[in-house]
């Protein structure tokens, strides 16, 4: 019989200012003048790759939005996902929660002042979601690598002042646990793949897409997979007044099982966090975000019963 326990983790991670430098905000926006138009999503992708940050998906959202909704909010708007497998695997040794920000995400967008901007999670934001200490050397290295990529992508750029809310009463993470039953001849990989197929068949009809999934091999795990997931009906209204939402979207669902442990863990950063983290005030947009959180939570509750 499958066993399930659903745990909503809501504690805010206390972070020392001394290890977070000047930026204790959960997201960061790096910006530079682009009046000549020489910088674009493709040049950003190449620059990230040059420093060892691999951009696996880099979507022109305006193309999607114009076809689906008939209008766009920004002259240029891309959502991209990126990783550094070496650092991710190091963090997996002790912190499977790294899967909740694997891949990392960014929005690449034009400003009204002819600037180009990139929004990503800061070190504080990475630590907050994963509960990996902000003093962890590998997490710091990851943050520094992102910083190097941003400077490479936007020469002479600078970080903009961000004053979003730091505290929230909402759950930071939505997490489930269950057990997989093995039938004759099955492996845990077989059952996990079956779960993945069922999961995707449930989320697709209600507007969720999986731009990319990752399978990591690691000696400590029977399996460790992450799914990068997006729902256009959420990101479209959010991005109108909050283009920096790309630091959170697409969001990642991690599913893993440690060797010697019967428990299968499934978790993702709660989508409802966007409301406070991005200072969303528009009622219709808030409703779209809450609907997206509830839909994903309900689907995973059903699948893990």
Model-derived regions: residue spans:
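Bacterial N-terminal signal peptides that target proteins for export
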Residues: 1-8
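Compact, glycine-rich, soluble single-domain proteins
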Residues: 74-99, 211-242, 246-248
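A short, solvent-exposed beta-edge/loop patch
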Residues: 112-137, 254-305
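Terminal, regulation- and interaction-focused segments at domain boundaries
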Residues: 22-64, 155-202, 210-212, 219
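Second-shell loop/turn segments in exported
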Residues: 29-35, 77, 128-137, 180-186, ...
């Amino acid at each position: 019989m499958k066993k399930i326990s659903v745990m909503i983790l809501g504690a805010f991670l206390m972070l020392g200012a001394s290890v977070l430098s000047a930026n204790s905000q959960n997201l960061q926006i790096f910006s530079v003048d682009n009046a000549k138009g020489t910088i674009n999503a493709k040049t950003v992708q190449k620059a990230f790759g040059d420093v060892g940050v691999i951009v696996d998906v880099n979507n022109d959202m305006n193309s999607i939005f114009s076809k689906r909704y008939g209008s766009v909010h920004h002259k240029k708007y891309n959502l991209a996902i990126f990783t550094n497998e070496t650092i991710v695997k190091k963090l997996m040794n002790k912190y499977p929660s790294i899967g909740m920000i694997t891949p990392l995400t960014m929005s690449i967008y034009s400003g009204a002042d002819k600037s180009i901007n990139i929004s990503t999670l800061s070190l504080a934001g990475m630590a907050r979601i994963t509960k990996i200490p902000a003093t962890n050397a590998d997490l710091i290295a990851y943050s520094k690598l992102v910083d190097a990529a941003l400077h490479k992508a936007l020469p002479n750029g600078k970080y903009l002042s961000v004053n979003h809310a730091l505290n929230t009463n909402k759950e930071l993470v939505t997490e489930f646990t269950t057990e997989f039953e093995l039938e004759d001849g099955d492996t845990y990989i077989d059952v996990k793949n079956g779960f993945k197929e069922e999961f995707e068949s449930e989320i697709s009809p209600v507007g969720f897409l999986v731009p990319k999934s990752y399978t990591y091999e690691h000696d400590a795990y029977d399996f460790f997979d992450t799914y990068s997931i997006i729902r256009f009906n959420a990101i479209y209204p959010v991005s109108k007044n909050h283009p920096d939402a790309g630091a959170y979207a697409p969001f990642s669902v991690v599913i893993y099982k440690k060797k010697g442990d019967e428990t299968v863990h499934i978790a993702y950063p709660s989508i409802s966090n966007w409301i406070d983290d991005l200072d969303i005030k528009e009622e219709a947009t808030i409703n779209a975000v809450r609907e997206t959180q509830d839909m994903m939570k309900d689907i995973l509750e059903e699948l893990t019963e």
